[in-house]
């Protein structure tokens, strides 16, 4: 005889009563305790299975949450590092720009100072040239003045001496009123006699 459940036996008894088997006594099988134990075991197993399943699900969900948490953390880290790298790139670019600007500004200042020094040097050279030419001109002018003065003095000396004798006839002195004139070159020379 195979194993039947309690509900199957009850249905069999009911059908026997309907058919006329009134003296049939329903007897529960002797293996009730064992079946109860088995059911208890299966119930325990199912409970443990449920627990293990729940714990498995929990562990899986925990793993998932942990992985997602790790992913989110790694994403945050990567995002932060990306932001940092972008900011670093920006700062590096700005630093490079500032360095290039400083270099260009220095070169511009140098070129301006060089231009100024070149202009001042040119001015000083032109000033020196003008000063030298002025000195040369002044020297030549002084020399010409000296030569002119010398020639003028020599001319005065040459011209004054006979002219002085020519003007003596105008003066009233102790000479005789008789005067003799003769031409000596370009000037009239007066010959006077005493009284």
UniProtKB/Swiss-Prot annotation:
Residues 1-163 are annotated as: Disordered. GO terms for biological process: sporulation resulting in formation of a cellular spore. Sequence repeats lie at residues 36-48, 49-61, 62-74, 75-87, 88-100, 101-113, 114-126, 127-140, 141-154. Keywords: Repeat, Sporulation. Residues 36-154 are annotated as: 9 X 13 AA approximate tandem repeats of [HY]-K-K-S-[HYFC]-[RC]-[TS]-[HY]-K-K-S-R-S. Residues 1-22 have a biased composition (Basic and acidic residues). Residues 31-163 have a biased composition (Basic residues). It comes from the Bacteria. Homodimer. NCBIfam families: CotG_ExsB_Nterm (NF047410), spore_coat_G (NF047411). May be a morphogenetic protein that is required for the incorporation of protein CotB into the spore coat. This is Spore coat protein G. It comes from Bacillus subtilis (strain 168).
